[in-house]
Structure formats: C-alpha cells, structure tokens
Amino acid sequence: MSIKVILTDIEGTTSAVSFVFDVLFPYAAKHLPDFVRQNAQRADVAEQLDAVRRDSNEPQADVERVVEILLAWIAEDRKATPLKALQGMVWEQGYQAGQLKGHVYPDAVEALQRWHQAGYQLFVYSSGSIQAQKLIFGCSEAGDLTPLFSGYFDTTSGPKREPQSYTNIQQAIGVEPQEILFLSDIVQELDAAQSAGLQTCGLAREGGELEGHVTVDSFTGIEPEAF
C-alpha cells in the first residue's frame, strides 16, 4: 500500500532546534509576563490562565503567581498545553510585528513543495500549539508555506511518544496507518508511530542513525514512493 500522507515534526526536522530554543523560547519568556498582565481579562487568555491554575493545583493563584508558574514551566521545557497556547499568542504578536521569522530548512521547503505538487497530503504534528505551527510556516523566511498543508496536530491529540496519539491522528485524517509516513528526529516518537502502524523516516541532520528506522540527513534523501 503506497504512501498518501506525510506527517512531519517541526523541531529538528523541518526547522532548526536552535530556532525554537535560541529564538522562540527566549522571546516568549521575555514578553509573556507583560502579555499575560495586559490581557488577563481577554476571554482566550483567561481560559488558559484558568488551565494553568488547574494543572498546577493552585485554583486561587493570582495573575502574578500564574506568571511565576509559566516562567518555571518554560525553564524546565514543560510541554503544558496552556503554556503552549499562551506562547503561541505571544509569538503571533512577534510575527505580526515582523520581529520573528519562522525558520524552515531550504531542503524541507523544496521537498514539501514537491510533495504537495505530487499529490501527497501534508500534515504537521508538533508539541508546539497548532497556532504556533501555523506561525512558523505562515511567516517563514521562505514566505507563507501554510497552503502546502492539509492540517495540523498538537498535544491535544496526545503525547508524541505514545502510540495512541498516532492512532488518533490517523483516524482523524481518515487513511490506513501504513499510508502515512511520519518524519521526526526523535527515536521515541518514531517508535511510537511505528507501533501504531505508520511508516517512519528519521531525520539525523548531524549524521548518525535512528535505530530501527530509515534515517536520512535532510529532506533531499526522502523518497515517499520507496516506503
């Protein structure tokens, strides 16, 4: 059965890990406190602040305490859904102001465009919020790449190292598991996808091997028809 869908990770796969850790995270950490203070009454922001209180078991936390919790989560790289949502709102302001441009490797841009033209459906699955995913690709150094994608998945579909998450995504897309090729630089994510029946390809941009998976060092080496 041939590949119909290509599902890709972002960090370390389409985009440099350094962009996320050296550019996006520091930008969010710097601007998040004032953003939360200034927008705490906004419905979409208030909803996420309540989620922070719930997740931290501090239902009475005031805005300043919530800011403290968020900064602690950023420091420990916690994959908390409300943090990801709020970071996405801060990044959106940064992209709109022209202070941020999404990094996407040129080899990934070229391959994604080629696969889209060849009729493959392209989807993203990242621990960053769907909003943040759309910003990286929508305001990228290569322009607006969002027309290439059919959809986006984040941690609301489940953690990336659990097979059930990939089953959830496969069922949402509506194809057979073996018709999906999943791309990632993390072997535990590839293992989880493989356990759910997906085809896998590992990105080792610094070289090396992702054990148990076809491994390439750039998108140039990926041929979906070979899976």
Curated annotation (Swiss-Prot):
Assigned keywords, A-Z: Amino-acid biosynthesis, Hydrolase, Magnesium, Metal-binding, Methionine biosynthesis
CDD domains (alphabetical): HAD_EP
Pfam family, any one: Hydrolase
GO terms (BP aspect): L-methionine salvage from methylthioadenosine
Reactions accelerated catalytically: 5-methylsulfanyl-2,3-dioxopentyl phosphate + H2O = 1,2-dihydroxy-5-(methylsulfanyl)pent-1-en-3-one + phosphate
Domain of life, per lineage: Bacteria
Gene Ontology MF annotations: 2,3-diketo-5-methylthiopentyl-1-phosphate enolase activity; 2-hydroxy-3-keto-5-methylthiopentenyl-1-phosphate phosphatase activity; acireductone synthase activity; magnesium ion binding
Needed cofactors: Mg(2+)
Gene3D superfamilies in UniProt: 1.10.720.60, HAD superfamily/HAD-like (3.40.50.1000)
Top enzyme class: hydrolase
Coiled-coil annotated spans: none
Note on cofactor: Binds 1 Mg(2+) ion per subunit.
InterPro entries hit by this protein: Enolase-ppase_E1, HAD-like_sf, HAD-SF_hydro_IA, HAD_sf
Functional pathway: Amino-acid biosynthesis; L-methionine biosynthesis via salvage pathway; L-methionine from S-methyl-5-thio-alpha-D-ribose 1-phosphate: step 3/6; Amino-acid biosynthesis; L-methionine biosynthesis via salvage pathway; L-methionine from S-methyl-5-thio-alpha-D-ribose 1-phosphate: step 4/6
The EC number(s) this enzyme carries: 3.1.3.77
Assembly description: Monomer.
NCBIfam families the UniProt entry points to: enolase-ppase, HAD-SF-IA-v1
PANTHER family: ENOLASE-PHOSPHATASE E1
Similarity section: Belongs to the HAD-like hydrolase superfamily. MasA/MtnC family.
Function: Bifunctional enzyme that catalyzes the enolization of 2,3-diketo-5-methylthiopentyl-1-phosphate (DK-MTP-1-P) into the intermediate 2-hydroxy-3-keto-5-methylthiopentenyl-1-phosphate (HK-MTPenyl-1-P), which is then dephosphorylated to form the acireductone 1,2-dihydroxy-3-keto-5-methylthiopentene (DHK-MTPene).
Name this protein carries in UniProt: Enolase-phosphatase E1
Organism listed in the record: Pseudomonas fluorescens (strain Pf0-1)
Record gene name: mtnC
